[in-house]
């Protein structure tokens, strides 16, 4: 699902530029639109190297123009490069010109023309949100951490597969000691030949990814200390610093969503409104009831919210939202569906927090302090002392005062 946060288009320019970009080249179609009823083709550049884009624009594209770029991997970078040299640009959905005509005319310059014509005709009303440089870096950290965890898990599964196939003692699953336990096993069983070489190679890969994961988690923790939005999200039950970092990095500015329901839909946690009997039957075969969730939305947001729902049901059952979840389960609702419902509630609360709405009461203060006590160790005592927090208690009290200090002391936190 494309973000509902799109930037509103500013006043129309005299020249409309459609751009179809690839990894190494792009096609440009420029239209003169002083009369919107009779747009005239001004110039076309059928093939231009991306490295020459700035020079091409300065020599061929008028300043009073706006460039329409189809969403792709490098579209945000191209938009920023154009803005750096004084040209306006906007990114539109990748399906904005997907129709029968496009299927018949699969050419770069034709796509560029169609983008320009779609804007001229008024079919493009808004642009896709582009994250700021800082939050783009946060997203890169998140993607790197996600990929590292995947590679570490794959490597661990390969080690397990070899040990199971050869009848060796299966290695323990804890990360830091896995490599040493496998080396001891190789020595005790006197394993030799290619299998020994293969296990040693996989252990080296596993330890590399483990160190990489720890380094990226340190970067996340450092970012959270400096970002009040991320810290504030940790007030929510089921959200530790990984979830808080990812949700804040992906959303950035909650005000780009007009309501919490829009953010919920963006996360893919809203049930389908118009569903066919076939879709509902497929959902029932998977154990679901009623209308299923759609397959759209940001999977990273959906993942962390549903995981938080599982955590609340298993570990925070005495909280208000945990009690609500178990009431639904006791009424016969499937547990997985209840987890999604809790995740939908959490992303709604997150919308209010990211908007800067003040904490309404002290109900979650106790849980938040315990999270801060645990979070103290993520950066290490030496780093925390440098930041001015000599003990865990000092850090927890300081963070708690930041979000709960405006509330009267008479409103006590629930245990």
Q: Which residues does each predicted region cover?
A:
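Low-complexity, acidic/Ser/Thr- and charged residue-rich accessory regions of DNA metabolism proteins
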Residues: 325-343, 347-415
């Amino acid at each position: 699902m494309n973000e509902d946060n799109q930037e509103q288009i500013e006043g129309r320019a005299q020249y409309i530029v459609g751009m179809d970009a690839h990894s190494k080249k792009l096609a440009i179609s420029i239209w003169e639109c002083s009369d919107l009823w009779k747009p005239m083709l001004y110039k076309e550049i059928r093939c231009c190297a991306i490295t020459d884009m700035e020079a091409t624009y300065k020599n061929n594209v008028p300043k009073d123009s706006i460039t329409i770029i189809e969403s792709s991997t490098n579209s945000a970078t191209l938009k920023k490069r154009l803005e750096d040299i004084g040209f306006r640009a906007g990114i539109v959905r990748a399906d904005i010109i997907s129709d029968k005509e496009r299927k018949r005319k699969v050419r770069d310059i034709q796509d560029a023309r169609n983008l320009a014509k779609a804007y001229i005709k008024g079919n493009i009303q808004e642009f896709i949100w582009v994250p700021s440089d800082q939050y783009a870096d946060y997203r890169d950290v998140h993607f790197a951490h996600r990929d590292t965890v995947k590679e570490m898990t794959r490597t661990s599964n390969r080690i397990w597969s070899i040990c199971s196939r050869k009848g060796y003692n299966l290695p323990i699953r804890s990360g830091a000691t896995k490599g040493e336990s496998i080396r001891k096993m190789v020595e005790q069983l006197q394993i030799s030949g290619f299998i020994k070489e293969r296990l040693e190679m996989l252990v080296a890969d596993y330890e590399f990814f483990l160190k990489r994961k720890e380094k990226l988690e340190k970067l996340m923790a450092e970012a959270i200390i400096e970002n009040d939005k991320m810290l504030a999200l940790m007030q929510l039950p089921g959200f530790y610093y990984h979830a808080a970092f990812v949700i804040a990095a992906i959303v950035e500015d909650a005000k780009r969503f007009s309501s919490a329901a829009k953010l919920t839909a963006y996360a893919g946690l809203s049930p389908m409104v118009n569903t066919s009997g076939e879709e509902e039957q497929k959902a029932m075969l998977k154990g679901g009831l009623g209308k299923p969730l759609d397959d759209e939305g940001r999977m990273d947001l959906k993942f962390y919210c549903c995981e938080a729902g599982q955590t609340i049901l298993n570990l925070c059952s005495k909280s208000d939202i945990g009690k609500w979840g178990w009431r639904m389960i006791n009424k016969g609702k499937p547990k997985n569906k209840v987890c999604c419902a809790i995740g939908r509630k959490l992303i709604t609360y997150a919308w209010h927090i990211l908007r800067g709405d003040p904490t309404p009461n002290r109900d979650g203060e106790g849980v938040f302090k315990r999270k801060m006590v645990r979070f103290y160790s993520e950066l290490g005592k030496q780093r925390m002392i440098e930041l001015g927090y000599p003990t865990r208690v000092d850090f927890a009290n300081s963070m708690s005062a930041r979000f709960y200090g405006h509330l009267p002391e008479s409103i006590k936190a629930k245990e």
